[in-house]
Amino acid sequence: MEIALVPLENGGAMTVRGGGEAGTGCSQAIGGELQCPPTAGLSDGPKEPAPRARGTQRGVDPGGRPLPPLPQDPQQPRRLPPEDEEGEGDPALGMAEDQVLGAGSLHHQRVLINISGLRFETQLGTLAQFPNTLLGDPAKRLRYFDPLRNEYFFDRNRPSFDGILYYYQSGGRLRRPVNVSLDVFADEIRFYQLGDEAMERFREDEGFIKEEEKPLPRNEFQRQVWLIFEYPESSGSARGIAIVSVLVILISIITFCLETLPEFRDERELLRHPPVPHQPLGPSRGANGSGPLAPPSGPTVAPLLPRTLADPFFIVETTCVIWFTFELLVRFFACPSKAEFSRNIMNIIDVVAIFPYFITLGTELAEQPGGGGGGQNGQQAMSLAILRVIRLVRVFRIFKLSRHSKGLQILGKTLQASMRELGLLIFFLFIGVILFSSAVYFAEADNQETHFSSIPDAFWWAVVTMTTVGYGDMRPVTVGGKIVGSLCAIAGVLTIALPVPVIVSNFNYFYHRETDHEEQAALKEEQGSQSHGTGLDSGGPRKASWSKGSLCKAGVSLENADGARRGSCPLEKCNLKAKSNVDLRRSLYALCLDTSRETDL
Protein backbone atom coordinates (compact mmCIF):
# COMPACT_ATOMS: atom_id res chain seq x y z
CA MET A 1 0.00 0.00 0.00
CA GLU A 2 1.32 3.38 -0.91
CA ILE A 3 1.00 6.34 1.42
CA ALA A 4 0.88 9.78 -0.09
CA LEU A 5 2.70 12.35 1.99
CA VAL A 6 1.80 16.00 1.65
CA PRO A 7 4.71 18.45 1.77
CA LEU A 8 4.18 20.94 4.59
CA GLU A 9 4.93 24.62 4.42
CA ASN A 10 6.72 26.33 7.29
CA GLY A 11 8.10 23.07 8.57
CA GLY A 12 4.73 21.67 9.61
CA ALA A 13 4.11 24.31 12.28
CA MET A 14 0.57 25.68 12.41
CA THR A 15 -0.97 28.59 14.22
CA VAL A 16 -3.95 27.62 16.33
CA ARG A 17 -6.33 30.04 17.98
CA GLY A 18 -9.06 28.78 20.20
CA GLY A 19 -9.11 25.38 18.52
CA GLY A 20 -10.05 26.85 15.11
CA GLU A 21 -8.47 26.38 11.74
CA ALA A 22 -4.89 27.18 10.98
CA GLY A 23 -4.07 30.35 9.25
CA THR A 24 -7.10 32.25 10.55
CA GLY A 25 -6.43 35.93 10.02
CA CYS A 26 -3.08 35.16 8.26
CA SER A 27 -1.75 36.08 4.80
CA GLN A 28 0.74 34.23 2.62
CA ALA A 29 4.06 35.86 1.89
CA ILE A 30 6.12 35.56 -1.28
CA GLY A 31 8.29 32.83 0.12
CA GLY A 32 5.30 30.62 0.81
CA GLU A 33 5.35 31.23 4.57
CA LEU A 34 2.35 32.43 6.58
CA GLN A 35 2.48 35.82 8.24
CA CYS A 36 -0.04 36.18 11.11
CA PRO A 37 -0.89 39.19 13.29
CA PRO A 38 -0.43 38.89 17.05
CA THR A 39 -4.16 38.42 17.60
CA ALA A 40 -4.49 35.65 15.11
CA GLY A 41 -3.19 32.95 17.45
CA LEU A 42 -1.05 32.17 20.41
CA SER A 43 2.42 31.92 18.92
CA ASP A 44 4.22 30.67 15.80
CA GLY A 45 5.55 27.12 16.01
CA PRO A 46 9.27 26.35 15.63
CA LYS A 47 10.54 25.73 12.13
CA GLU A 48 11.43 22.07 12.32
CA PRO A 49 11.30 19.32 9.72
CA ALA A 50 7.98 17.62 9.42
CA PRO A 51 7.71 14.35 11.32
CA ARG A 52 8.21 11.32 9.11
CA ALA A 53 5.91 8.37 8.97
CA ARG A 54 6.98 5.50 11.17
CA GLY A 55 9.15 3.04 9.18
CA THR A 56 9.17 5.06 5.92
CA GLN A 57 11.36 7.58 4.17
CA ARG A 58 10.36 10.83 2.54
CA GLY A 59 9.50 10.35 -1.22
CA VAL A 60 9.60 6.54 -1.26
CA ASP A 61 6.99 3.89 -0.72
CA PRO A 62 7.31 1.05 1.78
CA GLY A 63 8.97 -1.04 -0.92
CA GLY A 64 11.69 1.55 -1.47
CA ARG A 65 10.43 2.66 -4.88
CA PRO A 66 10.41 6.41 -5.62
CA LEU A 67 7.04 8.13 -5.75
CA PRO A 68 5.95 10.44 -8.52
CA PRO A 69 5.85 14.12 -7.57
CA LEU A 70 2.44 15.47 -6.63
CA PRO A 71 1.01 18.68 -7.99
CA GLN A 72 1.25 21.59 -5.54
CA ASP A 73 -0.80 24.74 -5.34
CA PRO A 74 1.48 27.52 -4.16
CA GLN A 75 -1.50 29.77 -3.38
CA GLN A 76 -3.39 27.30 -1.17
CA PRO A 77 -1.19 25.34 1.24
CA ARG A 78 -2.56 21.95 2.16
CA ARG A 79 -3.45 20.99 5.74
CA LEU A 80 -2.74 17.78 7.49
CA PRO A 81 -5.59 15.37 7.91
CA PRO A 82 -7.38 15.62 11.23
CA GLU A 83 -5.94 12.35 12.41
CA ASP A 84 -2.40 13.53 11.67
CA GLU A 85 -3.01 16.81 13.56
CA GLU A 86 -4.21 14.98 16.59
CA GLY A 87 -1.70 12.17 16.46
CA GLU A 88 1.44 13.98 15.35
CA GLY A 89 1.96 17.60 16.43
CA ASP A 90 4.27 19.94 18.22
CA PRO A 91 3.92 19.51 22.04
CA ALA A 92 4.73 23.23 22.54
CA LEU A 93 1.41 24.11 20.92
CA GLY A 94 -0.52 22.05 23.44
CA MET A 95 1.35 23.55 26.37
CA ALA A 96 0.78 27.09 25.14
CA GLU A 97 -2.90 26.41 24.61
CA ASP A 98 -3.21 24.86 28.07
CA GLN A 99 -1.51 27.83 29.68
CA VAL A 100 -3.76 30.42 28.07
CA LEU A 101 -6.94 28.44 28.48
CA GLY A 102 -5.94 27.49 32.03
CA ALA A 103 -5.37 31.13 32.98
CA GLY A 104 -8.77 32.07 31.62
CA SER A 105 -10.59 29.12 33.12
CA LEU A 106 -8.95 29.39 36.55
CA HIS A 107 -11.19 32.34 37.29
CA HIS A 108 -14.26 30.19 36.60
CA GLN A 109 -12.91 27.04 38.20
CA ARG A 110 -15.25 25.66 40.82
CA VAL A 111 -14.27 25.00 44.41
CA LEU A 112 -16.01 22.96 47.11
CA ILE A 113 -16.39 24.31 50.65
CA ASN A 114 -17.61 21.97 53.39
CA ILE A 115 -19.14 23.71 56.41
CA SER A 116 -19.67 21.06 59.11
CA GLY A 117 -20.98 18.57 56.55
CA LEU A 118 -22.94 21.02 54.38
CA ARG A 119 -21.24 21.54 51.01
CA PHE A 120 -21.19 24.82 49.12
CA GLU A 121 -19.84 25.23 45.60
CA THR A 122 -18.60 28.48 44.11
CA GLN A 123 -15.92 29.78 41.75
CA LEU A 124 -12.37 30.76 42.58
CA GLY A 125 -12.92 34.11 40.91
CA THR A 126 -15.76 34.85 43.32
CA LEU A 127 -13.49 34.29 46.31
CA ALA A 128 -10.58 36.17 44.70
CA GLN A 129 -12.55 39.44 44.82
CA PHE A 130 -11.43 39.87 48.42
CA PRO A 131 -7.84 38.57 48.57
CA ASN A 132 -7.25 39.72 52.14
CA THR A 133 -9.95 37.47 53.60
CA LEU A 134 -9.60 33.87 54.73
CA LEU A 135 -11.35 32.38 51.71
CA GLY A 136 -9.90 34.85 49.22
CA ASP A 137 -6.26 34.26 50.15
CA PRO A 138 -4.99 30.87 48.89
CA ALA A 139 -2.27 30.74 51.53
CA LYS A 140 -4.75 31.32 54.36
CA ARG A 141 -7.35 28.80 53.22
CA LEU A 142 -4.78 26.13 52.36
CA ARG A 143 -4.58 24.89 55.94
CA TYR A 144 -8.26 23.88 55.74
CA PHE A 145 -7.88 21.90 52.48
CA ASP A 146 -8.70 18.18 52.47
CA PRO A 147 -6.81 16.52 49.58
CA LEU A 148 -8.77 13.26 49.87
CA ARG A 149 -12.13 14.93 49.36
CA ASN A 150 -10.77 17.77 47.22
CA GLU A 151 -12.56 20.37 49.33
CA TYR A 152 -12.03 22.94 52.07
CA PHE A 153 -13.48 21.88 55.40
CA PHE A 154 -14.52 24.37 58.11
CA ASP A 155 -16.04 23.25 61.39
CA ARG A 156 -18.11 26.41 61.73
CA ASN A 157 -21.75 27.50 61.97
CA ARG A 158 -23.58 26.30 58.84
CA PRO A 159 -26.46 28.82 58.61
CA SER A 160 -24.03 31.71 58.93
CA PHE A 161 -22.11 30.71 55.81
CA ASP A 162 -25.07 31.69 53.63
CA GLY A 163 -24.41 35.30 54.56
CA ILE A 164 -20.63 34.88 54.27
CA LEU A 165 -20.86 33.41 50.76
CA TYR A 166 -23.33 36.12 49.74
CA TYR A 167 -20.71 38.66 50.78
CA TYR A 168 -18.38 37.31 48.08
CA GLN A 169 -21.10 36.85 45.49
CA SER A 170 -22.58 40.34 45.91
CA GLY A 171 -19.26 42.14 45.95
CA GLY A 172 -19.25 43.25 49.57
CA ARG A 173 -22.86 43.32 50.81
CA LEU A 174 -23.20 41.56 54.15
CA ARG A 175 -26.60 40.25 55.22
CA ARG A 176 -27.20 38.25 58.38
CA PRO A 177 -29.51 35.22 58.05
CA VAL A 178 -32.65 35.58 60.14
CA ASN A 179 -31.99 32.35 62.04
CA VAL A 180 -28.52 33.42 63.19
CA SER A 181 -27.96 35.56 66.27
CA LEU A 182 -25.89 38.72 66.23
CA ASP A 183 -23.02 37.45 68.34
CA VAL A 184 -22.68 34.20 66.35
CA PHE A 185 -22.62 36.02 63.02
CA ALA A 186 -20.13 38.55 64.37
CA ASP A 187 -17.84 35.68 65.40
CA GLU A 188 -18.10 34.23 61.89
CA ILE A 189 -17.17 37.60 60.37
CA ARG A 190 -14.07 37.70 62.53
CA PHE A 191 -13.18 34.07 61.74
CA TYR A 192 -13.39 34.52 57.97
CA GLN A 193 -11.38 37.75 58.33
CA LEU A 194 -13.75 39.94 56.34
CA GLY A 195 -12.14 43.01 57.87
CA ASP A 196 -13.05 45.93 60.09
CA GLU A 197 -14.91 47.72 57.32
CA ALA A 198 -17.30 44.80 56.85
CA MET A 199 -17.82 44.63 60.61
CA GLU A 200 -18.63 48.34 60.77
CA ARG A 201 -21.14 48.04 57.92
CA PHE A 202 -22.70 45.03 59.63
CA ARG A 203 -23.10 46.95 62.89
CA GLU A 204 -24.65 49.90 61.07
CA ASP A 205 -27.10 47.65 59.23
CA GLU A 206 -28.10 46.01 62.49
CA GLY A 207 -28.86 49.37 64.10
CA PHE A 208 -25.76 49.82 66.22
CA ILE A 209 -24.67 53.38 66.78
CA LYS A 210 -21.27 54.01 65.27
CA GLU A 211 -18.60 54.72 67.80
CA GLU A 212 -17.27 58.22 67.51
CA GLU A 213 -13.60 58.45 66.73
CA LYS A 214 -11.60 60.11 69.45
CA PRO A 215 -9.65 63.03 67.99
CA LEU A 216 -6.09 63.37 69.23
CA PRO A 217 -3.62 66.25 68.94
CA ARG A 218 -0.95 65.99 66.27
CA ASN A 219 1.88 67.02 68.56
CA GLU A 220 3.29 64.06 70.44
CA PHE A 221 3.66 65.89 73.77
CA GLN A 222 0.16 67.33 73.57
CA ARG A 223 -1.20 63.90 72.68
CA GLN A 224 0.36 62.33 75.76
CA VAL A 225 -0.92 65.11 78.03
CA TRP A 226 -4.39 64.91 76.50
CA LEU A 227 -4.57 61.15 77.00
CA ILE A 228 -3.45 61.46 80.62
CA PHE A 229 -6.04 64.08 81.59
CA GLU A 230 -8.93 63.05 79.31
CA TYR A 231 -8.85 59.23 79.10
CA PRO A 232 -8.16 57.58 82.48
CA GLU A 233 -8.01 54.10 80.95
CA SER A 234 -5.15 54.96 78.60
CA SER A 235 -2.27 54.42 81.06
CA GLY A 236 -1.31 54.03 84.69
CA SER A 237 -0.41 57.70 85.11
CA ALA A 238 -3.79 58.66 83.65
CA ARG A 239 -5.52 56.48 86.24
CA GLY A 240 -3.48 58.16 88.98
CA ILE A 241 -4.53 61.62 87.77
CA ALA A 242 -8.15 60.45 87.66
CA ILE A 243 -7.99 59.18 91.25
CA VAL A 244 -6.55 62.50 92.46
CA SER A 245 -9.26 64.41 90.59
CA VAL A 246 -12.03 62.29 92.10
CA LEU A 247 -10.64 62.78 95.62
CA VAL A 248 -10.46 66.56 95.14
CA ILE A 249 -14.05 66.63 93.87
CA LEU A 250 -15.26 64.63 96.87
CA ILE A 251 -13.38 66.88 99.31
CA SER A 252 -14.87 69.96 97.68
CA ILE A 253 -18.42 68.59 97.91
CA ILE A 254 -17.97 67.52 101.53
CA THR A 255 -16.62 70.97 102.41
CA PHE A 256 -19.55 72.61 100.65
CA CYS A 257 -21.96 70.60 102.79
CA LEU A 258 -20.12 70.88 106.13
CA GLU A 259 -19.77 74.66 106.09
CA THR A 260 -23.56 74.97 106.32
CA LEU A 261 -23.73 73.22 109.71
CA PRO A 262 -24.87 75.57 112.53
CA GLU A 263 -21.73 75.24 114.65
CA PHE A 264 -19.41 75.93 111.72
CA ARG A 265 -21.65 78.64 110.37
CA ASP A 266 -21.80 80.53 113.70
CA GLU A 267 -18.04 80.28 114.06
CA ARG A 268 -17.54 81.69 110.59
CA GLU A 269 -19.93 84.54 111.31
CA LEU A 270 -17.97 85.40 114.45
CA LEU A 271 -14.75 85.39 112.46
CA ARG A 272 -16.22 87.56 109.76
CA HIS A 273 -18.22 89.93 112.00
CA PRO A 274 -16.79 89.98 115.57
CA PRO A 275 -18.55 92.10 118.24
CA VAL A 276 -17.19 95.63 118.82
CA PRO A 277 -15.63 95.82 122.33
CA HIS A 278 -16.16 99.62 122.81
CA GLN A 279 -19.88 99.58 122.02
CA PRO A 280 -21.86 101.33 124.85
CA LEU A 281 -24.70 99.41 126.49
CA GLY A 282 -27.31 102.14 126.26
CA PRO A 283 -28.42 103.92 123.13
CA SER A 284 -26.10 106.79 122.34
CA ARG A 285 -27.18 110.01 120.80
CA GLY A 286 -25.53 111.79 118.04
CA ALA A 287 -23.87 115.15 118.26
CA ASN A 288 -27.16 117.01 117.97
CA GLY A 289 -29.07 114.47 120.07
CA SER A 290 -31.48 113.76 117.23
CA GLY A 291 -31.02 110.00 117.03
CA PRO A 292 -28.96 107.00 118.02
CA LEU A 293 -25.41 106.87 116.95
CA ALA A 294 -24.63 104.20 114.36
CA PRO A 295 -22.12 101.59 115.51
CA PRO A 296 -18.70 102.07 114.05
CA SER A 297 -18.13 99.72 111.15
CA GLY A 298 -14.41 100.27 110.76
CA PRO A 299 -13.25 97.50 113.12
CA THR A 300 -15.71 95.06 111.48
CA VAL A 301 -14.80 95.61 107.83
CA ALA A 302 -11.11 96.40 107.98
CA PRO A 303 -9.83 92.97 109.11
CA LEU A 304 -12.33 91.09 106.92
CA LEU A 305 -9.82 89.76 104.38
CA PRO A 306 -7.32 88.35 106.93
CA ARG A 307 -10.14 86.58 108.77
CA THR A 308 -11.47 85.14 105.50
CA LEU A 309 -8.04 83.88 104.52
CA ALA A 310 -7.69 82.24 107.93
CA ASP A 311 -10.96 80.32 107.52
CA PRO A 312 -10.22 76.55 107.22
CA PHE A 313 -13.06 76.06 104.76
CA PHE A 314 -11.69 78.84 102.60
CA ILE A 315 -8.24 77.23 102.62
CA VAL A 316 -9.67 73.87 101.56
CA GLU A 317 -11.79 75.55 98.91
CA THR A 318 -8.77 77.43 97.60
CA THR A 319 -6.76 74.21 97.33
CA CYS A 320 -9.53 72.47 95.41
CA VAL A 321 -10.03 75.41 93.05
CA ILE A 322 -6.29 75.54 92.34
CA TRP A 323 -6.40 71.91 91.24
CA PHE A 324 -9.56 72.44 89.16
CA THR A 325 -8.06 75.48 87.47
CA PHE A 326 -4.79 73.70 86.75
CA GLU A 327 -6.62 70.70 85.28
CA LEU A 328 -8.87 72.89 83.14
CA LEU A 329 -6.01 74.97 81.75
CA VAL A 330 -3.86 71.92 80.97
CA ARG A 331 -6.73 70.23 79.17
CA PHE A 332 -7.53 73.41 77.26
CA PHE A 333 -3.99 73.90 75.95
CA ALA A 334 -3.58 70.19 75.12
CA CYS A 335 -6.96 69.66 73.43
CA PRO A 336 -7.01 68.97 69.66
CA SER A 337 -9.71 71.60 68.97
CA LYS A 338 -10.26 74.70 71.09
CA ALA A 339 -13.70 75.30 69.57
CA GLU A 340 -14.94 71.80 70.33
CA PHE A 341 -13.49 72.05 73.82
CA SER A 342 -15.38 75.29 74.49
CA ARG A 343 -18.69 73.82 73.30
CA ASN A 344 -18.45 70.67 75.41
CA ILE A 345 -21.05 70.68 78.18
CA MET A 346 -18.69 69.00 80.66
CA ASN A 347 -16.08 71.70 80.17
CA ILE A 348 -18.74 74.37 80.67
CA ILE A 349 -19.63 72.69 83.97
CA ASP A 350 -15.95 72.80 84.97
CA VAL A 351 -15.85 76.55 84.34
CA VAL A 352 -19.10 77.14 86.23
CA ALA A 353 -17.83 75.08 89.17
CA ILE A 354 -14.78 77.30 89.77
CA PHE A 355 -16.38 80.59 88.77
CA PRO A 356 -18.06 81.33 92.19
CA TYR A 357 -14.74 81.17 94.01
CA PHE A 358 -13.21 83.98 92.00
CA ILE A 359 -16.37 86.08 92.36
CA THR A 360 -16.29 85.59 96.12
CA LEU A 361 -12.60 86.46 96.29
CA GLY A 362 -13.15 89.55 94.16
CA THR A 363 -16.00 90.67 96.39
CA GLU A 364 -13.85 90.28 99.50
CA LEU A 365 -11.07 92.31 97.93
CA ALA A 366 -13.52 95.02 96.84
CA GLU A 367 -14.96 95.37 100.34
CA GLN A 368 -11.56 95.54 102.03
CA PRO A 369 -10.70 99.24 101.55
CA GLY A 370 -14.25 100.45 102.20
CA GLY A 371 -14.95 102.88 105.02
CA GLY A 372 -17.90 103.16 107.34
CA GLY A 373 -20.71 104.57 105.26
CA GLY A 374 -24.35 104.67 106.10
CA GLY A 375 -25.39 102.50 103.15
CA GLN A 376 -22.57 99.98 103.42
CA ASN A 377 -24.54 97.51 105.55
CA GLY A 378 -27.24 97.36 102.91
CA GLN A 379 -24.67 96.79 100.19
CA GLN A 380 -23.08 94.02 102.22
CA ALA A 381 -26.44 92.34 102.71
CA MET A 382 -27.10 92.51 98.97
CA SER A 383 -23.66 91.16 98.13
CA LEU A 384 -24.08 88.32 100.62
CA ALA A 385 -27.39 87.36 99.02
CA ILE A 386 -25.76 87.32 95.60
CA LEU A 387 -22.84 85.30 96.92
CA ARG A 388 -25.21 82.70 98.38
CA VAL A 389 -26.78 82.24 94.98
CA ILE A 390 -23.37 82.05 93.32
CA ARG A 391 -22.07 79.59 95.88
CA LEU A 392 -25.02 77.39 95.10
CA VAL A 393 -23.45 76.83 91.69
CA ARG A 394 -20.65 74.94 93.41
CA VAL A 395 -22.99 72.00 93.75
CA PHE A 396 -22.52 71.39 90.02
CA ARG A 397 -19.10 69.98 90.84
CA ILE A 398 -20.86 66.71 91.48
CA PHE A 399 -21.24 66.40 87.70
CA LYS A 400 -17.46 66.44 87.33
CA LEU A 401 -17.55 62.87 88.59
CA SER A 402 -19.27 61.80 85.37
CA ARG A 403 -15.94 62.19 83.57
CA HIS A 404 -14.60 59.29 85.63
CA SER A 405 -17.81 57.25 86.06
CA LYS A 406 -19.25 55.04 83.32
CA GLY A 407 -22.53 54.79 85.20
CA LEU A 408 -23.12 58.54 85.17
CA GLN A 409 -22.20 58.66 81.49
CA ILE A 410 -24.74 55.93 80.74
CA LEU A 411 -27.37 57.83 82.74
CA GLY A 412 -26.64 61.02 80.82
CA LYS A 413 -26.89 59.24 77.47
CA THR A 414 -30.15 57.62 78.60
CA LEU A 415 -31.70 60.96 79.50
CA GLN A 416 -30.45 62.47 76.25
CA ALA A 417 -31.98 59.64 74.22
CA SER A 418 -35.24 59.82 76.20
CA MET A 419 -35.86 63.55 75.85
CA ARG A 420 -38.95 62.95 73.72
CA GLU A 421 -40.50 60.61 76.29
CA LEU A 422 -39.61 62.98 79.14
CA GLY A 423 -41.21 65.83 77.22
CA LEU A 424 -44.40 63.81 76.78
CA LEU A 425 -44.37 62.98 80.50
CA ILE A 426 -44.08 66.63 81.48
CA PHE A 427 -46.80 67.57 79.00
CA PHE A 428 -49.20 64.94 80.40
CA LEU A 429 -48.44 66.07 83.96
CA PHE A 430 -49.10 69.67 82.99
CA ILE A 431 -52.51 68.76 81.57
CA GLY A 432 -53.37 66.71 84.67
CA VAL A 433 -52.28 69.48 87.05
CA ILE A 434 -54.46 72.06 85.31
CA LEU A 435 -57.44 69.70 85.12
CA PHE A 436 -57.43 68.34 88.68
CA SER A 437 -56.44 71.58 90.41
CA SER A 438 -59.42 73.29 88.79
CA ALA A 439 -61.72 70.40 89.70
CA VAL A 440 -60.66 70.26 93.37
CA TYR A 441 -60.96 74.03 93.73
CA PHE A 442 -64.59 74.09 92.59
CA ALA A 443 -65.37 70.92 94.58
CA GLU A 444 -64.07 72.58 97.78
CA ALA A 445 -65.29 76.11 97.07
CA ASP A 446 -68.37 75.94 99.35
CA ASN A 447 -66.49 74.61 102.36
CA GLN A 448 -65.20 77.12 104.89
CA GLU A 449 -62.33 74.85 105.99
CA THR A 450 -60.96 74.35 102.51
CA HIS A 451 -57.20 74.40 101.91
CA PHE A 452 -57.56 75.55 98.31
CA SER A 453 -57.94 79.29 98.17
CA SER A 454 -57.31 79.48 94.41
CA ILE A 455 -56.55 77.33 91.39
CA PRO A 456 -52.81 78.26 91.36
CA ASP A 457 -52.73 77.40 95.06
CA ALA A 458 -54.03 73.92 94.15
CA PHE A 459 -51.21 73.31 91.65
CA TRP A 460 -48.92 72.10 94.41
CA TRP A 461 -51.53 69.61 95.66
CA ALA A 462 -52.10 68.27 92.11
CA VAL A 463 -48.37 67.76 91.47
CA VAL A 464 -47.82 66.01 94.82
CA THR A 465 -50.87 63.80 94.29
CA MET A 466 -50.09 62.83 90.68
CA THR A 467 -46.54 61.86 91.62
CA THR A 468 -47.97 59.76 94.53
CA VAL A 469 -45.91 61.66 97.12
CA GLY A 470 -48.75 63.04 99.25
CA TYR A 471 -47.23 65.37 101.86
CA GLY A 472 -50.59 65.95 103.53
CA ASP A 473 -50.19 69.71 103.98
CA MET A 474 -53.13 70.27 101.61
CA ARG A 475 -56.00 67.79 101.41
CA PRO A 476 -59.63 67.80 100.33
CA VAL A 477 -62.32 67.55 103.05
CA THR A 478 -65.54 67.19 101.05
CA VAL A 479 -66.79 64.08 99.31
CA GLY A 480 -66.44 65.68 95.88
CA GLY A 481 -62.90 66.79 96.66
CA LYS A 482 -61.91 63.28 97.79
CA ILE A 483 -63.32 61.79 94.57
CA VAL A 484 -61.29 64.29 92.55
CA GLY A 485 -58.20 63.42 94.62
CA SER A 486 -58.67 59.69 93.95
CA LEU A 487 -58.98 60.27 90.20
CA CYS A 488 -55.92 62.53 90.32
CA ALA A 489 -53.81 59.81 92.00
CA ILE A 490 -54.92 57.13 89.50
CA ALA A 491 -54.26 59.41 86.53
CA GLY A 492 -50.83 60.25 87.90
CA VAL A 493 -49.86 56.58 88.24
CA LEU A 494 -50.94 55.84 84.66
CA THR A 495 -49.26 58.94 83.26
CA ILE A 496 -45.90 58.24 84.89
CA ALA A 497 -45.98 54.52 84.09
CA LEU A 498 -46.40 54.98 80.33
CA PRO A 499 -42.96 56.39 79.35
CA VAL A 500 -41.00 54.52 82.02
CA PRO A 501 -40.50 51.29 79.95
CA VAL A 502 -39.04 53.30 77.07
CA ILE A 503 -36.58 55.02 79.39
CA VAL A 504 -35.61 51.70 80.98
CA SER A 505 -35.12 50.19 77.52
CA ASN A 506 -32.78 53.02 76.55
CA PHE A 507 -30.82 52.53 79.75
CA ASN A 508 -30.44 48.80 79.09
CA TYR A 509 -29.35 49.51 75.54
CA PHE A 510 -26.59 51.92 76.54
CA TYR A 511 -25.52 49.71 79.44
CA HIS A 512 -25.14 46.58 77.30
CA ARG A 513 -23.51 48.64 74.58
CA GLU A 514 -20.86 49.81 77.01
CA THR A 515 -20.25 46.34 78.42
CA ASP A 516 -20.14 44.76 74.94
CA HIS A 517 -17.65 47.39 73.82
CA GLU A 518 -15.34 46.52 76.70
CA GLU A 519 -15.65 42.79 75.95
CA GLN A 520 -14.95 43.33 72.26
CA ALA A 521 -11.88 45.40 73.06
CA ALA A 522 -10.55 42.64 75.29
CA LEU A 523 -11.38 40.03 72.64
CA LYS A 524 -9.57 42.00 69.94
CA GLU A 525 -6.45 42.17 72.07
CA GLU A 526 -6.59 38.43 72.74
CA GLN A 527 -7.18 37.59 69.07
CA GLY A 528 -4.36 39.89 68.02
CA SER A 529 -1.90 38.12 70.29
CA GLN A 530 -3.07 34.69 69.15
CA SER A 531 -2.90 35.55 65.45
CA HIS A 532 0.60 36.95 65.91
CA GLY A 533 1.74 33.73 67.55
CA THR A 534 0.20 31.41 64.97
CA GLY A 535 1.55 33.49 62.11
CA LEU A 536 5.10 33.07 63.33
CA ASP A 537 4.75 29.34 63.84
CA SER A 538 2.92 28.31 60.70
CA GLY A 539 4.18 30.72 58.08
CA GLY A 540 6.86 28.39 56.72
CA PRO A 541 4.79 25.22 56.29
CA ARG A 542 1.99 27.17 54.63
CA LYS A 543 4.34 28.62 52.07
CA ALA A 544 5.89 25.22 51.29
CA SER A 545 2.48 23.55 50.90
CA TRP A 546 1.25 26.31 48.61
CA SER A 547 4.31 25.97 46.35
CA LYS A 548 3.77 22.23 46.04
CA GLY A 549 0.12 22.73 45.19
CA SER A 550 0.97 25.26 42.50
CA LEU A 551 3.31 22.76 40.83
CA CYS A 552 0.64 20.08 40.90
CA LYS A 553 -1.94 22.40 39.39
CA ALA A 554 0.32 23.29 36.44
CA GLY A 555 0.16 19.74 35.11
CA VAL A 556 -3.64 19.41 35.16
CA SER A 557 -5.39 20.01 31.84
CA LEU A 558 -8.83 21.56 31.41
CA GLU A 559 -10.42 18.36 30.11
CA ASN A 560 -9.23 16.28 33.03
CA ALA A 561 -10.43 18.92 35.51
CA ASP A 562 -13.91 18.95 33.96
CA GLY A 563 -14.00 15.17 34.02
CA ALA A 564 -12.96 15.16 37.65
CA ARG A 565 -15.77 17.57 38.54
CA ARG A 566 -18.32 15.45 36.73
CA GLY A 567 -17.03 12.29 38.31
CA SER A 568 -16.95 13.71 41.85
CA CYS A 569 -20.69 14.26 42.18
CA PRO A 570 -21.67 10.63 42.92
CA LEU A 571 -18.89 10.31 45.47
CA GLU A 572 -20.00 13.45 47.28
CA LYS A 573 -23.56 12.16 47.45
CA CYS A 574 -22.27 8.89 48.85
CA ASN A 575 -20.28 10.75 51.48
CA LEU A 576 -23.34 12.71 52.52
CA LYS A 577 -25.31 9.49 52.91
CA ALA A 578 -22.63 7.73 54.96
CA LYS A 579 -24.04 7.34 58.44
CA SER A 580 -21.74 4.75 59.93
CA ASN A 581 -18.02 4.17 60.17
CA VAL A 582 -18.17 1.32 57.67
CA ASP A 583 -19.88 3.45 55.04
CA LEU A 584 -17.44 6.25 55.68
CA ARG A 585 -14.44 3.96 55.20
CA ARG A 586 -15.94 2.60 52.01
CA SER A 587 -16.51 6.06 50.62
CA LEU A 588 -12.95 7.09 51.44
CA TYR A 589 -11.63 3.91 49.82
CA ALA A 590 -13.67 4.61 46.67
CA LEU A 591 -12.38 8.16 46.66
CA CYS A 592 -8.77 6.97 46.80
CA LEU A 593 -9.36 4.58 43.89
CA ASP A 594 -10.80 7.36 41.73
CA THR A 595 -7.76 8.13 39.58
CA SER A 596 -9.59 10.66 37.41
CA ARG A 597 -10.08 13.00 40.38
CA GLU A 598 -7.30 15.56 40.59
CA THR A 599 -6.22 17.55 43.59
CA ASP A 600 -7.41 21.15 43.22
CA LEU A 601 -5.71 23.69 45.42
Curated annotation (Swiss-Prot):
Membrane topology, from the record: Multi-pass membrane protein
Reactions listed under catalytic activity: K(+)(in) = K(+)(out)
Keywords: Cell membrane, Glycoprotein, Ion channel, Ion transport, Isopeptide bond, Lipoprotein, Membrane, Palmitate, Potassium, Potassium channel, Potassium transport, Transmembrane, Transmembrane helix, Transport, Ubl conjugation, Voltage-gated channel
Lipidation (S-palmitoyl cysteine): 335
GO terms for MF: alpha-actinin binding; delayed rectifier potassium channel activity; outward rectifier potassium channel activity; protein kinase binding; scaffold protein binding; voltage-gated potassium channel activity involved in atrial cardiac muscle cell action potential repolarization; voltage-gated potassium channel activity involved in bundle of His cell action potential repolarization; voltage-gated potassium channel activity involved in SA node cell action potential repolarization
Record Pfam families: BTB_2 (PF02214), Ion_trans (PF00520)
Residue intervals annotated with topology Cytoplasmic: 1-236, 335-345, 405-419, 512-601
Family stated for the protein in its record: Belongs to the potassium channel family. A (Shaker) (TC 1.A.1.2) subfamily. Kv1.5/KCNA5 sub-subfamily.
Assembly: Homotetramer and heterotetramer of potassium channel proteins. Interacts with DLG1, which enhances channel currents. Forms a ternary complex with DLG1 and CAV3. Interacts with KCNAB1. Interacts with UBE2I. Interacts with XIRP2; the interaction is required for normal action potential configuration in the heart.
Written domain comment of the UniProt record: The amino terminus may be important in determining the rate of inactivation of the channel while the C-terminal PDZ-binding motif may play a role in modulation of channel activity and/or targeting of the channel to specific subcellular compartments. The transmembrane segment S4 functions as a voltage-sensor and is characterized by a series of positively charged amino acids at every third position. Channel opening and closing is effected by a conformation change that affects the position and orientation of the voltage-sensor paddle formed by S3 and S4 within the membrane. A transmembrane electric field that is positive inside would push the positively charged S4 segment outwards, thereby opening the pore, while a field that is negative inside would pull the S4 segment inwards and close the pore.
The name this protein goes by in its record: Potassium voltage-gated channel subfamily A member 5
